Amino acid sequence: MKAIITVVGKDKSGIVAGVSGKIAELGLNIDDISQTVLDEYFTMMAVVSSDEKQDFTYLRNEFEAFGQTLNVKINIQSAAIFEAMYNI
């Protein structure tokens, strides 16, 4: 399983640490990561994977709830969606 995680919110310390900790807690591996601050807003994109099958509804709910604790918006999408778009 491969997925794309995006994080957007007002910049503050601890966002990368918190999100990467949650990724590890959920049994996902960070394959690639990019983050920047645009004006005063933090943005991050990570490609994550797992050898095990993952329930995207569960992951989506977990990241949404966790994002609220950091005051950021966290989304997760299957990488298969993006791969399918390029195969049409």
From Swiss-Prot:
Any Pfam family the entry gives: ACT_6
Sequence ranges assigned to domain ACT in this UniProt record: 4-77
TM regions (residue ranges): none
InterPro entries: ACT-like_dom_sf, ACT_dom, UPF0237/GcvR_regulator, UPF0237_ACT
Domain of life: Bacteria
Subunit annotation: Homodimer.
Family designation: Belongs to the UPF0237 family.
Name of the protein this chain belongs to: UPF0237 protein SP_0238
Organism whose genome encodes this protein: Streptococcus pneumoniae serotype 4 (strain ATCC BAA-334 / TIGR4)
